Amino acid sequence: MTYEWAREKALKVARSILEGDVGIIEGARLLSSFGHELVPDWTLDPDFVVLGALDSETDHLPVGAERKLWEEKALAERDAIVSRIEAEAKEEVESACRNILRRFAGA
């Protein structure tokens, strides 16, 4: 993965989250995977810390394409948890997305 590739993907995902096309958890997972390429130390970067923390806290929950692998009853139980966590994290993740767009759009 190159810096430029990661930058372009991060910008696309950040926009998709803000436009509501990608869920908060799914988007945070994607964005957190680019942090190591975009910043010197993602664990010290306030935007990527938010994204990485949410990724870590929710790595047991099915989002995106992974949902197709889950049994319907188990999925329904997890959906309530996903909805609650996404509602709680929405403002902070969207702020990180706006910061990422501002920081990397002109880079």
Predicted segments with their positions:
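Acidic, Ser/Pro/Thr-rich low-complexity regulatory regions
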Residues: 1-107
